């Protein structure tokens, strides 16, 4: 059976997610693989070049010694650079770390791949010792210590001062996505824990309790509108007059955040689609906007919460992707929702999108019923 939670649509309205545009996927390991390929090719070319200039044994010793020297100096240079960071953190020791020296050092000298870095540093040091033991006279000249200290003390500080250590926008974006540090990640988690996790498991019961809509709502899911513009109308009928407000489901009353029997209530919307024979077919949906998107819209329009148009477009894509990941992993919510990305600019298209998704969901429901019957 097809995954009911997938973003879907049919026909003309399914042009790049209903006009929303492409939804990006998480970044993979292509950059790491490319770096490894460059490393291998460069190493091989250097080895060939050294072998042509010098005797094979001497050339290999030179290449190994220089690589170990530069690697060790680079690691030590990074430690020296981070020591400079400590000088700033000491000014905030009481406010940020409650006066804890261990906290200052931990946040400054923590490495994600500390084990690998330690192995590389020790291996480089042992390699230097071995090569010096084997050919001390060849590698004991004054040029090598100067090169070591330049690469250890001068170059790291210079690169830090001129900004070469600054992460690129791509790296910053990748880091934020991996560690859930984007604005969109926080909004998606808040939307889930503060609302969807509470109402989606109860949605079927609320529909069943409604004498008016229990037989009219044939797809028992919450349809969540996700406009790329992030602007949410106070009434969906303003975005598409064919989507009419029909009524409400019985409320779910939940004790939440000090409020006893807090009320959560879904709106039901009706769409009337004319058929070729002149009759009209009615569809009923439990439908609403994703309310956190309005926060993104207002942030992009507020001077003290600067969020440019391109940044907002990026965040809304991340919001949809993160929300889908969260809901797909939740047994309580899986199969009880449909994400409906739309452009937000084109009016009078929401009804077409919803009817197309209704048809796809109905087919999935029939397939599921047939499978259960066969079993």
Swiss-Prot record:
Single GO MF descriptor: cyclic-di-GMP binding
Regions that span the bilayer: 30-50, 60-80, 114-134, 144-164
Record Gene3D superfamilies: 1.20.5.5200, Stimulator of interferon genes protein (3.40.50.12100)
InterPro entries: STING, STING_C_sf, STING_LBD, STING_TM
Chain residues that bind 2',3'-cGAMP: 195, 256, 262
GO terms under cellular component: autophagosome; endoplasmic reticulum membrane
Key words, A-Z: Immunity, Innate immunity, Membrane, Transmembrane, Transmembrane helix
Main location per the UniProt record: membrane
Topology of this chain in the membrane: Multi-pass membrane protein
Highest taxon listed in the record's lineage: Eukaryota
GO BP of this protein: activation of innate immune response; autophagosome assembly; innate immune response; positive regulation of macroautophagy; positive regulation of type I interferon production; reticulophagy
Subcellular location: Membrane
Stated role: Facilitator of innate immune signaling that acts as a sensor of second messenger signals produced by cyclic GMP-AMP synthase-like receptors (cGLRs) and promotes the production of type I interferon. Innate immune response is triggered in response to nucleotides from viruses and bacteria delivered to the cytoplasm. Acts by binding cyclic dinucleotides: recognizes and binds 2'-3' linked cGAMP (2'-3'-cGAMP), a second messengers produced by cGLRs in response to nucleotides in the cytosol, such as double-stranded RNA (dsRNA).
Family: Belongs to the STING family.
Name of protein: Stimulator of interferon genes protein 2
Organism: Stylophora pistillata
Lineage: Eukaryota, Metazoa, Cnidaria, Anthozoa, Hexacorallia
Gene field: STING2
